[in-house]
């Protein structure tokens, strides 16, 4: 999304996938150094939101995309553009999950020692989405309780992630996940 022609090609591919019934998940993963400037980054990231079904943002990305310091109001601004669920990762405080009807913060999974937070947001989102997929139904029919369980799973996976060093090495393996996957 940082440069043309990949930016417009990606957006068209997302629109086509959406037309064919694909669930569109989006994590802007903003990295200032990759963009020409902040204005271009914001416009590009915002252009994707109307196509999205579920979206994960960090606190910084939420403020950047909405210019709204109140997280609940900011999430509602994004929800009005199309996504059914917005998850805001809050670091050691957990994650705020918002839909048009509900907004709640799910506390982070307690850990003995935080070693490195690199990749924690990605691990959260992977855990969230994997729990969603286990339900085997459309995002539009998930109950609030099921959405909350997705967030709990995401926090559990992120909790494992932060106890190791490095982005890729910290991603939990199948054995490490076996206890929480059965939940």
Features from the language model and the residues they span:
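Conserved beta-alpha-beta core of the PfkB/ribokinase-like small-molecule kinase fold
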Residues: 1-77, 83-84, 93-94
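Conserved phosphate-binding/catalytic region of the ribokinase-like
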Residues: 15-16, 67-183
């Amino acid at each position: 999304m940082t440069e043309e022609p990949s930016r417009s090609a990606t957006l068209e591919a997302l629109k086509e996938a959406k037309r064919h019934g694909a669930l569109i998940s989006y994590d802007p993963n903003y990295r200032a150094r990759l963009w020409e400037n902040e204005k271009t980054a914001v416009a590009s990231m915002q252009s994707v939101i109307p196509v999205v079904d579920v979206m994960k943002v960090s606190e910084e990305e939420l403020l950047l995309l909405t210019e709204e310091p109140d997280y609940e109001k900011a999430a509602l601004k994004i929800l009005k553009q199309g996504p059914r669920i917005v998850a805001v990762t809050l670091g050691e405080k957990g994650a705020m999950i918002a839909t048009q009807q509900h907004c709640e913060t799910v506390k982070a999974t307690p850990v003995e020692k935080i070693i490195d937070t690199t990749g924690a947001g990605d691990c959260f989102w992977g855990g969230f989405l994997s729990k969603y997929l286990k339900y085997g139904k459309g995002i539009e029919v998930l109950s609030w309780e099921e959405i909350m369980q997705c967030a709990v799973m995401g926090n559990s996976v992120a909790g494992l992630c932060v106890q190791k060093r490095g982005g890729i090495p910290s991603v939990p393996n199948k054995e490490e996940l076996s206890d929480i996957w059965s939940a």
